[in-house]
């Protein structure tokens, strides 16, 4: 029996990866220095896995930005706006696709399945695939030559790669995949020729609700690869849920099949018991949760391994995490400030690999060798049970299915009379640039090196500065800027009971953007007002409305590491109940325009269609519960980003927010197209420019977005706003972009007057 890993966190123990990238983008380091740092990190990650005694160590999972972007560039799938014809892609090309450039809009970015990782969407229209290099081969040879590691190259499989892309017609799916197949065959053949004995081909899309026709297409794809390269050592890897067509998947002509026995594990286990497993294949079993940070109950996991052994011989069983460890932090070893009981039940990437080794030893009958580890595991779980953190009432049942007593059509005239806003009102999503000074002020205060009085005075100065800037720009609805917030989830978690925070528990969200998710370890409850002071101060500086800014219950849930002993709906409603108190406090303080952000509501959507309605029901219920009690004149806003929202437009409508803003610009008009087929009759803002790129769009460019949106949405309900918060942008580009945005809105108003 062997152990395997599917992928390792890229960012480094101290976010060295992030720092190297941002230093390069700021022109503080050269390309050579960047590549040298990245190589050092890459090799170090391999050494760590080698020290953890992982038998099959992944290579090629490391990236300079995103692994899907890597595949697109490797296959020459580079939109024409980034390349002159015949050009070879450079590092500049690569980063321009991810981040945009002065002359070209960045490629779209969206969620990686139902996670908080974002990938760059390949654009297949007009693509002429060609192999620009064999990146998995380079990674394999580097590991072999530098460290003597016979690694397991990782490749995103052809079916999933195309399904994650855009710019192809569904009825031409087979033709599109066929155009890439010769390149896949060449990459795999060169790996085999170089001596690779295991090649991981990721096909996570096989756990979604694929059709029988598409499953037949997948079968044909792998038959063609097998015909071209007999006995290629392919491990077809799935994760995040159970496979939809178990019998067909395990019958594919590959050496091994990777199944997730954590997420969707019950269905995979049931299928294994019902249909068995081919005697000529290896089962790579995901038995350690790669997406959450709790230790495994090693005795329960050992029992699962024992159950698997009833159907698969030991020498054909590989133990591994349920998915890439990209989704968890690197190690707990620097978490010195956490409660010892809580720390004892946490396992990040390195600790999960240790658990794998322990389970391998147990399966081999070497219990004496891991006796100490088993006892420590027992003691840690017992201490958690004894702590009492998870006992007591879970949530108020009367919160479920609550809604505002008045319909939107009843509220709308009351709100219009109260707020007296112009047509196409302009606003921002919430945050303004967090400069080095802002971050330094927060850091000094947290360390106790700055008094609370001085900290609050400084924060007020930032708020006053940006209220003045917003008024000078002519924005209609203002925000206080969120300078006191390091992270939109962490900020609230720190002020609610039931949350804990790591010192170094960073994970990659997109590009160099890392987040430090809070840990929900116990029952969540309200303690005191969290946002009232800053918002009320901002409102005192202006006659224009200032929005209160909250993070919604579903986003707090989806962007946290969540306790594993309660249904998610219960935890979501606990958070909603806490937020009702904050909404009430804002309203009582005179803040009657309140934004409850739900950027992560889409990413929690289950991957199988049959499981989605249940999730949407409780997600909508939790959001509505947080604000169902407000006055009819109080205007509730929400914001969402990076998602295929046309899939869930009914649920968005059911949220019953008075105004919703949605990320639009990176989808290059596709979000607007979705409204051609769907009627939406509440306030809505489709982001008119991409805030994830340093590029400043022109007034005309944003005006064109507004014009296009107004062909499918009524002007009387349309708002003008950026795609997302402006926290990560520089001040100069932020002011320039907002100036153009306000000018575009005013120009659009004039055009509407002329038409009228």
Swiss-Prot record:
5-methyltetrahydropteroyltri-L-glutamate binds at residues 15-18, 111, 513-514, 559, 603. Its cofactor is Zn(2+). It holds the Pfam family Meth_synt_2. Binds 1 zinc ion per subunit. The keyword Metal-binding applies. L-homocysteine binds at residues 429-431, 482, 597. GO terms for biological process: methionine biosynthetic process; methylation. Residues 399-411 have a biased composition (Basic and acidic residues). Zn(2+) binds at residues 639, 641, 663, 724. GO terms for molecular function: 5-methyltetrahydropteroyltriglutamate-homocysteine S-methyltransferase activity; zinc ion binding. InterPro entries: Cbl-indep_Met_Synth_N (IPR013215), Cobalamin-indep_Met_synthase (IPR006276), Met_Synth_C/arc (IPR002629), UROD/MetE-like_sf (IPR038071). Residues 392-411 are annotated as: Disordered. The active site is at residue 692. SUPFAM superfamilies: UROD/MetE-like (SSF51726). CDD domains: CIMS_C_terminal_like, CIMS_N_terminal_like. Pathway: Amino-acid biosynthesis; L-methionine biosynthesis via de novo pathway; L-methionine from L-homocysteine (MetE route): step 1/1. Belongs to the vitamin-B12 independent methionine synthase family. Catalyzes the transfer of a methyl group from 5-methyltetrahydrofolate to homocysteine resulting in methionine formation. This is 5-methyltetrahydropteroyltriglutamate--homocysteine methyltransferase.
